[in-house]
UniProtKB/Swiss-Prot annotation:
Protein's UniProt name: 2-isopropylmalate synthase
PANTHER family: 2-ISOPROPYLMALATE SYNTHASE 1, CHLOROPLASTIC-RELATED (PTHR10277:SF9), HOMOCITRATE SYNTHASE-RELATED (PTHR10277)
The species this protein was found in: Staphylococcus aureus (strain MRSA252)
Keyword Manganese: yes
Keywords: Amino-acid biosynthesis, Branched-chain amino acid biosynthesis, Cytoplasm, Leucine biosynthesis, Manganese, Metal-binding, Transferase
């Protein structure tokens, strides 16, 4: 019988530290609901003491989820722990995650503390946290660069103070397979407790070994894996949870351990994070990449046609990738469209379906057939427009002279107020973005601009992702349309709208 490996998802906390990623309040809540549907055991929803926005989103997630444990991060500071308590007290299973750095380089250059000071802080703050929480998780930050004897002392101190989950972070992705496994073996053999202690692994991918090291931790005695969807995170990212889960599933003969994830929700979860983070999943990404189940070589194609297992160790259906798609067309009616939404896993009320059906018919008039990816794109675009404080109403472009273009942009806010401005630029995109900047009265820097086609062919819808720097803060925007310029404008307006929402601003103020 396989042992259970808990999955601790930190997409909303560590994943959001990815440069350029800044989830909105609504996006955080939608992500948390999908993670619960996927079946993760614990969601690290944020760092409540870091900002009012983080506190409110953690609180909302705690009040919304029904089965998943909701965790908040806290430094060894009582005010941090209090903030986590207030944010998560309504959760079905509240958890606090207390951490302090333990490596020599952190003690000397960051904390300016001695080892004795660190041990005293661990004892004081884990003891305090245990008074408020049934479950306290402790992490010695930069554990893999901490001398092993001192690491054992830190963990023993935390356990004696009441911690029942011990997380060992490879904070800078420094460790390797055997070394990381040895740390867990040493801790499980050396640390004593009358309570059951769950050891957890948290790996970064700086040397490309986050998933490998996570699996090594299981071999060393870990029973929980921390990571993010698609492996997003600061620098090179975190362990990709979907890769860990499928490795355990496919190689159960070796690991003898399984997660409780609903694997059929894997692709949908990956797509959601990709969309909200504005980070396209690489085509060759394991498990969820577009090429994961593609075969170009003639020999490989021949083998797969004869027997799929000749070159595939898992089926697309296992992770929720459909291979029996029945596209819709311009003659498809509301009933067929509604059935398609259910088949794709969407639970959308009838009123919302009316607007989605109108968008579907508009696309069907332009395309021979509407694929599942088109349907997903329609819903994605609708979600973004529904959340936005401002949305694009009309866009007019005109060629002026000498390569200059003129753009007139009209946007509308949720109260129905109309805002309009115009500008010129060396090309359509520059003109459009200058006009939008004039409407919002903000100077911006365009950090990233990417166009992706939703499907193949010249009639494909275009997805545009932008990343802007506004007043020192990065925000991303997403737009989708058959017209690339319309999609580009929608994405730019959404990025501005996100900044305005988070800074409680109105256009023209």
């Amino acid at each position: 019988m396989s042992s259970h490996i808990q999955i601790f998802d930190t997409t909303l906390r560590d994943g959001e530290q990815t440069p350029g990623v800044n989830f909105t309040f609504d996006e955080r809540l939608r992500i948390a609901l999908q993670l619960e549907k996927w079946g993760v055991d614990v969601i690290e929803a944020g760092f409540p003491a870091s900002s009012t926005g983080s506190f409110k989103s953690v609180q909302a997630i705690a009040q919304t989820l029904t089965t998943t444990a909701v965790c908040g991060l806290a430094r060894c500071k009582k005010s941090d722990i209090d903030a986590v308590y207030e944010a998560t007290k309504d959760a079905a299973k509240p958890v606090v995650h207390v951490f302090i750095a333990t490596s020599p380089i952190h003690l000397e250059h960051k904390l300016k503390m001695s080892q004795e000071d660190v041990l005293a802080s661990i004892k004081e703050h884990v003891t305090y946290a245990k008074q408020l929480f049934d479950v306290v998780q402790f992490s010695p930050e930069d554990a893999t660069r901490t001398e092993l004897p001192f690491l054992v002392k830190c963990v023993q101190t935390a356990v004696d103070a009441g911690a029942t989950v011990i997380n060992i972070p490879d904070t800078v992705g420094y460790s390797y397979h055997d070394e990381y496994a040895h740390i867990f073996k040493t801790l499980t053999e050396s640390v004593t407790s009358s309570n059951e202690i769950i050891y957890s692994a948290h790996c970064h991918d700086d040397l490309g070994m986050a998933v490998s090291n996570s699996l090594a931790a299981i071999e060393g005695g870990a029973r929980r894996i921390e990571g993010t969807v698609n492996g997003i995170g600061e620098r090179a990212g975190n362990a990709a949870l979907e890769e860990v889960a499928l490795a355990l599933y496919i190689r159960n003969d070796h690991y003898g351990a399984q997660t409780a994830l609903n694997l059929e929700e894997t692709k949908k979860t990956s797509d959601l994070i990709s969309r909200y983070a504005g980070i396209r999943v690489p085509r060759n990404k394991a498990i969820v990449g577009q090429n994961a189940f593609s075969h170009e070589s003639g020999i490989h194609q021949d083998g797969v046609l004869k027997h799929r297992e000749t070159y595939e160790i898992m089926t697309p259906q296992l992770v929720g990738v459909s291979t029996t798609e029945l596209p819709l067309g311009k003659l498809s009616g509301k009933h067929a469209f509604s059935k398609k939404l259910k088949a794709l896993g969407y639970d959308i009320d009838k009123e919302a379906q009316i607007d989605l059906f109108k968008q579907f018919k508009a696309i069907a008039d332009k395309k021979k057939s509407v694929s599942d990816r088109d349907i997903h794109a329609i819903i994605q675009g609708s979600e973004h427009e529904h959340q936005a404080l401002y949305k694009l109403e009309t866009l007019q472009l005109q060629y002026v002279s000498s390569g200059l273009q003129s753009a007139v942009v009209v946007i509308k806010d949720k109260e129905g107020h109309i805002y309009q401005d115009s500008s010129i630029g060396t090309g359509s995109i520059v003109a459009i973005y200058n006009a939008v900047d004039r409407i919002f009265q903000k100077e911006t820097e365009l950090i990233d601009y990417r166009i992706n086609s939703v499907t193949e062919g010249t009639d494909a819808q275009a997805e545009v992702h932008v990343n802007l720097l506004i007043e020192g803060k990065t925000v991303n925007g997403f737009g989708i349309d058959h017209d690339i310029l319309q999609a580009s404008c929608k994405a730019y307006v959404e990025a501005h709208a996100k900044f305005a929402a988070e800074n409680v601003e109105k256009v023209g103020n």
